[in-house]
Amino acid sequence: MCVNNEKAQIPQSFPNLSGMNLRNILTSLLCVGLSVLHANAQTFDPIGSRNLDQVEALAMDFGLPSALYQPITGVDAFRVQYEMPFLDSTILVSGALFEPTDLDPSCPNPVHIYMHGTIFVRSDAPSFLSYEGQLGFLMAGLGFTVLMPDYVGLGEDDAHLHPYVHAESEAASGAYLIDALFTSENPLGNAHDANQIFVSGYSQGGHAAMALHRELQGNWPQYPVAASAPGSGPYSITGVQFPETFANPSYSNPSYLAYTALAWQSVYGNLFEDPSEYFQEPYASQLADLFDGQTPGWQINNALPFLTENFVQPGVLDLLLNEGEPFAVASADNDVYAWIPEAPLRMYYCTEDEQVFYQNALEAEAYMNENGAEQVEAINLGAYDHSDCAGQAIFGATLWFNAQATVCEPNSIDDQSATDQVFNPFPNPATDWVQVQPEHAQSNWTLHDARGLQMQSGIAHRIATSSLSPGLYFVNFPAQGLRLPIVIAR
């Protein structure tokens, strides 16, 4: 049934942000109104709708200034249930689909698939229109069809413990949701461009986005990635994330340590016989009840000690990182940086991130570029913690995609968005200056930081940036209705 479409209560900053072949589907039934679209094991259930004014109001609730974000369409949301392989079975999982409502349905939309961050409660998944799920309305409001997988063990799947930071299942949940979109009759009759698939995610979603990009490039040639932008993800679990975590006397989220161990045990089956082999009592005996899919992360963290020596069994940390140990083998299996992207890839990070250490992005960038990647960048968004970094990374990726994509104008089959004719700022990232328009042009522009504060204005073709702090900025061309992301790096 449809949810109440009253505005969700949105905090003022982004929060901390883990068979059968679907091509064999032969029949589908399209129903209208509050009905459900069925395609064998797939269903598309209406879960919400926002017209253009409501999307604009939602952007204001998220603190997105109109100078940086101007949607062009209303959006309808659907919960998708679809099949994917997991371990030795085919399982039914869920995800969210956000479709533009005011664009010509025969004009193919670009597709943005967003991989969500760490959650513990199943109903916090995107298809329940949770806080992070609300981002789908904003992303789709720019003219994209947006997909958000819930992942295994979350959303409608109550048969599994969520396999946290498990690259294979993260990637499969995204790839099979994309496949469901392209192989099923669309609930609104919209068309989609398989050559414009953009991938992003933040935190665990950054890890999942990297895994999905790798999976699509390697095994799904029919769905080439146009660009991807993972944010603050643990790409190098063996080389960065766990060594940095274990080197400190405390960790900001002890729930993550337990989540990882329990999840990997559920997948690999050889890490331990009992959680008490890794964790001290009384905590070890409490973990099954805490990770029940209904207990929020803050409550789990409050139940566990932040000092690692009070939580993890003595000597276990050294053992976990020993080559050949089951935990170390599982860690290596879930590293997602040792491959060579063929499409442009940006990794956004912040240097004060206390949850996912920024060296993950630097190690991934170094490996990829040293081994032949030509369009990979690690982008420093500044000295922000994990929560404050999220908005810049998620919004920056969204507008970076928007600057590259061909987006349909509202209700037009012939006219395309001007974004395919935009002068792309260069160099970008910039240090001392950035050129934002051709030398002969004299369009008025304003430069804004990620909070929407105006920093400069003018008509010159170059902007001096040497006095600006590192981070994400946007140049706004009011007359053309364009907002282009610029990264200042040092």
Where are each of the predicted segments found?
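C-terminal outer-membrane/trafficking sorting elements
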Residues: C2, S13-P15, L37-N40, Q416-R490
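C-terminal catalytic histidine-bearing segment of alpha/beta-hydrolase fold enzymes
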Residues: E323, A328-V329, Q355, L362-E363, ...
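Short beta-strand/loop motif that positions the catalytic acidic residue
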Residues: R346-D353
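Short, surface-exposed "cap/lid" segments of acyl-processing enzymes
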Residues: L87-T90, T101-L138
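Alpha/beta-hydrolase active-site loop
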Residues: Y164-P187
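Accessory cap/linker subdomain of secreted extracellular hydrolases
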Residues: G231-A338
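Catalytic-loop region of hydrolases
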Residues: A41-D104
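Short alpha-helix in the alpha/beta-hydrolase fold that links the catalytic acid
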Residues: L212, A343-L345, F357-Y367
